[in-house]
Every structure is written in structure tokens, then in C-alpha cells.
Swiss-Prot record:
One of its GO terms (biological process) is proton motive force-driven plasma membrane ATP synthesis. The lineage of its organism: Bacteria, Bacillati, Bacillota, Bacilli, Lactobacillales. Its EC number is 7.1.2.2. This is V-type ATP synthase alpha chain. ATP binds at residues 233-240.
Amino acid sequence: MNQGKIITVSGPLVVASGMQEANIQDICRVGHLGLVGEIIEMRRDQASIQVYEETSGIGPGEPVVTTGCPLSVELGPGLISEMFDGIQRPLDRFQKATDSDFLIRGVAIPSLDRKAKWAFIPKLSVGQEVVAGDILGTVQETAVIEHRIMVPYKVSGTLVAIHAGDFTVTDTVYEIKQEDGSIYQGSLMQTWPVRQSRPVAQKLIPVEPLVTGQRVIDTFFPVTKGGAAAVPGPFGAGKTVVQHQIAKFANVDIVIYVGCGERGNEMTDVLNEFPELIDPNTGQSIMERTVLIANTSNMPVAAREASIYTGITIAEYFRDMGYSVAIMADSTSRWAEALREMSGRLQEMPGDEGYPAYLGSRIAEYYERAGRVRTLGSQEREGTITAIGAVSPPGGDISEPVTQNTLRIVKVFWGLDAPLAQRRHFPAINWLTSYSLYQDDVGSYIDRKQQSNWSNKVTRAMAILQREASLEEIVRLVGLDSLSEQDRLTMAVARQIREDYLQQNAFDSVDTFTSFPKQEAMLTNILTFNEEASKALSLGAYFNEIMEGTAQVRDRIARSKFIPEENLEQIKGFTQKVTKEIHHVLAKGGI
């Protein structure tokens, strides 16, 4: 432990002297109040400390004491359904302990509840050899999540004691005799430094799609379990709603939602909505698989920088148990602004638009911790982390540094479009500018699993939308009537795809989530209409005759998004009705 004294205070940055025995990334207690801070720069005996709490009232001469430990998170039962701040202080228990609706400075509360007891069920027996990552036993944390207690990193040997029963997170539950003869006494909890990624046995190629229930994403721009995606867009385009929708309905085991520097009301929405929503995959409340990290815009700036790392470390812990995890960061731009503020106060040489020169490497560090892995341990298991980051470029300009550095790393770009949002087309993901580099892998995976021709249907639908974009210029100049019959059909089908398929109402109880079989049935109906109508045109039918003759069935196709999942056969039946109606037009003599 090293004690120095403050010589400078500049907002969240404190400089202390007499710190020659301290190390970079050490956690310190700053001032008489004991504020939490982290050393981010050392110059001779002077340490620059990033303080994670409000520094007003702190002055030169006050003491600074190092703990000798890096910023770490507590990992164990009690994480799920909890809401933490950026440095893993539990907000619910913080409020009860301080009897205040505001974050009282200098209050230290353990992240995991020390009084709660958890029923531990051993899976191994005394005498067995264990290595780091082995699952010793389980705790049923919620109705959905079985918390697997693992041997900590760098611990291996013979299991000499293991106890069943109810324990707190600090009670000794097992003992391991290590190779050097020492006895390691383990509890249900372990700690891990947030800036260091948890080790894995092997990184694997992600192939399984993450089904989000959002048609534009699952169809045209899918992300895999273990992939990384970015959602850039201007203000009001719907970034947060897209993030909320994925957090609610993605087919993952656990969701970590990091509210980083955004509005407090958005976290309030999450707290109000999530407990009432039922996960379509498990039938339980969505909160039973969710961890919330709230670092809103009115909370200390420095803690924004830590909140992203806190979230990804918790995600890695659950991944190591063999779970698939999705982490939502809303928004990485606010995190980058926190980096810029600290860099400016440190008087570092600025890069593009004032951001630090190391912005790209920090963003890469975060997204590279996502992926599909084979975990440590003698038991074979795989886990995944899917990282989805919202980016808020000022004025929607995606050429700014945060967006560009993010796009260099992630493989999926869901570009939100202000004109689409103004036309009330939500999700406002622009199908002409967005992309997914997982499209081919996911298409092949689905074709193989479903024994269907899904990838071909997606290609045909996208070709229709691209053809519409090229025809729009002509339509604006000379009008729709100047187009050929075939091109008018293309415009009509493209409108169907846009309005009846891609547009989705997040606030409608049925339309908010669409399962993959329903998506395929809906898209098949639209493409069948295009195919049959195109054949009818080639046989001499008139475009207007086809549109009038199929008006009723097209209306049913448009309404199929509001048909519940259990009536899927009804949607599939529209395919035959489309063919029948067009054949009826031909038989009637629409030539």
C-alpha cells in the first residue's frame, strides 16, 4: 500500500505525488472521502488518477491511498437480474444502504450480496483431478440460469473437499490441493480485472445465426453468435429501440445491457418493460437472463470508460460456463467521448476530431473480446459472446472517427437512415447501405439445417429492392406510367417487401417479434406473387388486371405480419391463393 497526496485536481483527473511504489491500473482511494480512482499514467513519483466519482470539494494536500489491485469485478451468483453502475456498484442495494436516490460519494458496497445464501450442488467428488475452468458444481440462480461454479484460472490439482448446501458467496465451498502442496480454498465467487480478457482454450469460427426476431436483420443482414455488429445512426433514427428489441428477443442464454452515457429515461424504460416481457425461447421473464449496467449521461464521465469493460468481463464469465451471451453497448460514442475528455486533460497529442490517437486500438480491444470459443477445462464446452454496439455520430456523419474505427473491426453494419425514420419506416435500417459479412455463412447454415432454399430467396428479394432503387430516378423524372409492365411489377413487389415485410412495429404485441419459420413463409408469399405475376405478364396479361385481380390476397399477405405464430399454416396457405388468383386472372382473359 502506497500513500501520496493530491497536488492537482482537474475535473475527473487528479494528480498525486509521492506515488513511486504505485503501478499503472492500480485502484486508489482519493481524498478524505475515499473516492474510487484508477491510475492511468505515471511520471516519476506523480500519478495521474482517473476518478470514477464526482471530484468537487476535493483539494490539494488530501491523501491518496493505493490498494495495489487493478479495477476488478466480482463474479458469482447474484449477477443476473441485478443493475450495476459502471464500476459494478449495485444500484438497488446502494439506494437502500444510503437512503438516497443519488450516488453518495465514497460509499463502498460489495458488488455481490454477502448475506444472500445460494444452494450449491456439487458435480465432482473428493479425489478427482481438476484444472482451471472445470465445473465443480451448480447454483440455480434464476428459473432460467444455472450458475456453474468453475475452478479459477491458474488453479489446478486434487479436489480434497467439496460441500453441498446453502452458502454465501464468501463461504469456503471447496478445497484443492495444488501441485506445490498448498491448499486453495475456494468460494462461490471469484474476481477478475476488467481490462484483461479471460483466457480460452481455442477461438472458433462463428457460424450459427443469432435470431433477433427483426425481419430486416435476420433476412438481409444477419449476425452470428460470436459475431460483432455496429448500429450507427443519427439522433432519433431508432438505435436504442433496435438494441432493446435484440436484448428482448435474441435467442441467446444471457443478455448484458450497458447503458453508457445515454439518457436515464432509456434505462428506466428497460426496467419498466423487461420484467413484464416473456422470453419466447424460455417462457420466463426476460429479466431472469439479463444483467444491466447503467452509466447514464448525468453520472461521472470517467465511469463510462469503465462500464464497457465491466460489461464485457461479466459476459466472458458467463461465456466460460458454456452459455451464449449478447452484450449491447449503447452507446460506444459516449464511451469514446469519455476517452477524449481524459486524453485532453492529460494533455496528450490529439488525433482526428480531438479523439486520442489510440482510439482505434481501444475499440478493437473491446470488439475482439467477442467471439465463439472453446473454454478452458477438461470438460468440452463452447461459449459465445455477440457484441452489438450503437454508435451516435454527430449529425449522422458516419465518416467520423468512432464510426470508421468501429467499421474496420465489426463484420455487420446496420446503417440507420434519417429519411427512413422521418417516413416512419422502422426499423430504419437502410437496405442499400447496410451489409453483413456473415450473410453467406448464415445462408449456407440455414439451407443445410432447414433443408430449404433460403439464401436464394434472400438474394432474389434484395435484387428486387436494388432494381427499385435504380428505377426511382426514372419514376421521379417521367412518372410511373412510363415504365414497362415488368418494371411496374418490380416497383409494386419492392413496395410490398418494404412495407409488408421490412417494416416492423416494435410496440405491437405480435409484430414485435417474428420467428424464423414465419419470416420464411412471409417472404415466400411475396416472392411467389412476383414470380407468378411475372409469368402472367410474359403470357400477355396486363399489369393493372393482375393488381386488381390479386388485391384481396395481397391485402392478406400485408396483414400476415399481425397473424400470431401459432397460425403459421394460415400464412403458408397464402402461397397457393396467390397462384390461384393469378391463374384466375389469366383464365378470365386478362389478355
